[in-house]
Amino acid sequence: MNARENQVRRFQQAMEQPIDIPMSSKELMLRMSFIDEEVKELRDEVVTAVKELGDTAEVSHEIRVKLLKELSDVMYVASGFAVTFGFPISRAFDRVHASNMSKMVDG
């Protein structure tokens, strides 16, 4: 487990949210609703950034900060999904990274 998942685990403990539980339809849908909500907020900021790029050919510091915040929220709720169900997300991420790196072609 990496530092991010440890932080989320501490948050879930403090908020008396479930950790390392068996999957249930109810909890899966709840966790997915958190992800959906945060992805929508990120999408809204991306749309704002695209509009700003069309108007000024650059993205303001304010919008960049909002994008970073929303991206971090997506990561947080994804980590919460992993913590809730006891997924070894760090190992899985490492495997995905290794797989992606193996797809690189020289030259």
Residue spans for each PLM region:
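Flexible "arm" and connector segments at domain edges
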Residues: 1-107
